[in-house]
Amino acid sequence: MNKILLFSVFIGLSVCSIAEARIRVTGRGAKMNFSADSIPDIQKPAFDLMQVKCIKCHTMERTVIAIQTGVAPITGQPFNKQAVKAYGIKMLRKPNSDMDKKEIRDIVVLLNYFLDENAK
């Protein structure tokens, strides 16, 4: 009886696996960032743009934590698609952001992708 149960559990675990859909993260603290390997090729230009533009004002750690927890680390407000859009508009209006509408749109799409992947 025990052998049958053990065999059944082994087969079940062998056939069924849990897929981790979350975006991988590298580093800790101020060096924390999304792993470029876990980002689809179509999103890589937006990711590269985010790596250059967003770190002018804050570390990527802030963005990673917001995506992982669903909470903006500074304000404590929900970090969802609506908030991402609002942050995009806010960044567009900042005089030193050096970002245009297309760049903001690309980064908003990327952040929404991260939110979707993290929710899986």
Role assignments for model-derived ranges:
Residues 22-49:
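Electrostatic cytochrome c docking/interface patches
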Residues 15-21:
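Sec/Tat signal peptide C-region and signal peptidase I cleavage site
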Residues 4-13:
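Sec-dependent N-terminal signal peptides
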Residues 51-61, 107-111:
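The canonical Cys-X-X-Cys-His
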Residues 40, 44, 48, 78, ...:
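Soluble non-cytosolic domains of exported or imported proteins
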Residues 47, 59-95:
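Gly/Gly-Pro-rich "capping" loops immediately C-terminal to redox-active cysteine motifs
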Residues 97-120:
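C-terminal capping alpha-helices of c-type cytochrome domains
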